[in-house]
Curated annotation (Swiss-Prot):
GO terms for cellular component: plasma membrane. GO terms for molecular function: nitrate transmembrane transporter activity. This is Nitrate import permease protein NrtB. It is a multi-pass membrane protein. Gene3D superfamilies: MetI-like. Coiled coil: none annotated. It comes from the Bacteria. Part of the ABC transporter complex NrtABCD involved in nitrate uptake. The complex is probably also involved in nitrite transport. Probably responsible for the translocation of the substrate across the membrane. It is found in: Cell inner membrane. GO terms for biological process: monoatomic ion transport; nitrate assimilation.
Amino acid sequence: MTADLSSPRRARRSPSSYLGALVGKTIRRSIPTAIAFFVLLGIWQLLCSGENAACRPIQVVQESWDLIIDPFYRGSGTDQGLFWQIAASLQRVAVGYLMAAIAGIALGILIGVSVLMFQALDPIFQVLRTVPPLAWLPISLAAFRDSQPAAIFVIFITAIWPIIINTAVGVQNIPQDYNNVARVLKLSRLDYFLKVLLPATVPYIFTGLKIAIGLSWLAIVAAEMLTGGVGIGFFIWDAYNSGSNSEVILAIIYVGLVGLLLNALVGFIASRVVPDEQK
């Protein structure tokens, strides 16, 4: 008697079973986060359990309930719901971040491929990147005479440095074997850029972009506290001046969640662009 050694054909999974497995996997991954969240809430409640303690979790929800249930409220001037406050901040971040990405990648490649440019510009970049973001705000206000472009400039000058540095490091770390093959094949500069330099540098570029998006969101919240207008930063500052600590805490939570989503968005794009063997 001979045994049938042929492997059984794998049954094709239905869309419903695949969706169920995905949901189950997501729930299992979320359990530790949920436990940590409730532990932090408990610690928060205990720390604010004195007779005169303020800003208990329940109190924050009660006092800021209108902002929670109506984020799309539209009033006059800066009297806007949290959705519009965050949207205004995100708009400034998007413009400044996009400008920083374009300029940062270009400059990073330039100083990465040219030893002379690296020696000339790297010391300047190292000095400028240590300047705190808000230190640029008075200069930008004096130059642009408007809070909107001034805030965008602060985003730009904050986000550009990690992009430049990581891109340059990526170019400098291209394996020498790649360059040797390019010389043997006599690739043109354009072909070398598209087929060798860019693919090898993409992981480093996205590392810089991921760092930059977090710094951009951090900087715009701080800058808006000084520039005013519609934006989550000025909302926090205005709530503080009004003595509404619950609104301040709620806004801080929203800021953290948006920052998490921005970081996840850049990470998701990187997972689709960066080849698996380079991750």
